[in-house]
């Protein structure tokens, strides 16, 4: 349940749907496994996984939702070889070349025949709806997966006025200033990893890892016009993260000490522990968002 990435969105209008109404709306789009002829299936699933029983899990007016996607695995090479074999057989028997339309029809037949025997894979994506911040945080490093989740949520609710979060000043400019100054605004602390890019399209990319970012070797690249597009940070003592210039957060990791905050509950009641961990995570992510918006100079006013 602990989020590992953040793709950030902001509501254009206040989100005021209560937990019960949200649960009802999502219920019409519940996930069901692939049938024999389904290529893929996509829908909402229990927010807390196998131990959960609701599509929405809420605490302190923060709502956790989850989507599950199942996809049949049909190797392109297998389809290609089967199609070539079938086309060659028919062309030999009928002594003619098949038209593209006929080949496409054969390909569809091959896929249909393979689907019942195909293996499938499942993936899950979670999102945290934060009405107090008018934000949605999607736990995904892929913008495509985040948009898939939002598209289904929009379909379930009828409308979903959200846009990607952006800031008043370019993030790369802010990160570059932090690196020049040798420190990030509190409560953030720079770590030992960064990616610098030239502002020119044809310019190079330089990556530093496990290196003191205050060294002259690193700062020299700023003098040549490069800007910081990725920067590893710590948020207080609770979270390690990689902040990117597109406002996404990768490699989000809650510290062991922070995650141990509910250890006194034990694991005798798994649902109680999950509920407590969700409340703990939600509160810290809200604090992180407040600090991030402040450190980056505020959200772009056109989104307000």
From Swiss-Prot:
Pfam families: RdgC. InterPro entries: RdgC. Its main location: cytoplasm. It is found in: Cytoplasm, Nucleoid. Keywords: Cytoplasm, DNA recombination. GO terms for molecular function: double-stranded DNA binding. GO terms for biological process: DNA recombination; regulation of DNA recombination. It comes from the Bacteria. GO terms for cellular component: bacterial nucleoid; cytoplasm. May be involved in recombination. NCBIfam families: PRK00321.1-3, PRK00321.1-5. Belongs to the RdgC family. This is Recombination-associated protein RdgC. It comes from Shewanella oneidensis (strain ATCC 700550 / JCM 31522 / CIP 106686 / LMG 19005 / NCIMB 14063 / MR-1).
């Amino acid at each position: 349940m602990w989020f590992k990435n953040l793709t950030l969105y902001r509501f254009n209008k206040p989100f005021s749907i209560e937990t019960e109404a949200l649960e009802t709306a999502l219920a019409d789009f519940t996930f069901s496994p692939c049938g024999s002829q389904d290529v893929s299936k996509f829908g909402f699933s229990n927010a807390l996984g196998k131990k959960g029983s609701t599509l929405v899990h809420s605490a302190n007016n923060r709502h956790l939702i989850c989507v599950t996607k199942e996809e049949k695995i049909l190797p392109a090479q297998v389809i290609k070889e089967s199609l070539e074999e079938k086309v060659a057989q028919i062309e030999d028997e009928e002594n003619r070349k098949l038209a593209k339309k006929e080949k496409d029809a054969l390909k569809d037949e091959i896929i249909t025949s393979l689907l019942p025997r195909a293996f499938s894979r499942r993936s899950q994506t979670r999102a945290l709806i934060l009405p107090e911040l008018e934000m949605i945080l999607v736990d995904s490093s892929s913008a495509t997966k985040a948009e898939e989740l939002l598209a289904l949520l929009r379909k379930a609710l009828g409308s979903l006025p959200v846009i990607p979060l952006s800031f008043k000043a370019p993030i790369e400019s802010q990160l570059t200033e932090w690196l020049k100054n040798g420190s990030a605004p509190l409560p953030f602390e720079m770590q030992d990893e960064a990616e610098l890019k030239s502002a020119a399209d044809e310019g190079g990319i330089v990556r530093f890892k496990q290196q003191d970012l205050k060294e002259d070797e690193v700062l020299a690249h700023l003098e040549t016009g490069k800007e910081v597009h990725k920067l590893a940070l710590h948020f207080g003592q609770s979270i390690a993260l990689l902040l990117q210039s597109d406002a996404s957060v990768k490699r989000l990791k809650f510290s062991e000490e922070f995650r141990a905050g509910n250890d006194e509950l034990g694991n005798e009641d798994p649902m109680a522990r999950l509920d407590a961990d969700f409340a703990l995570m939600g509160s810290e992510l809200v604090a992180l968002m407040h600090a991030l918006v402040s450190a980056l100079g505020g959200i772009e006013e056109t989104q307000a």
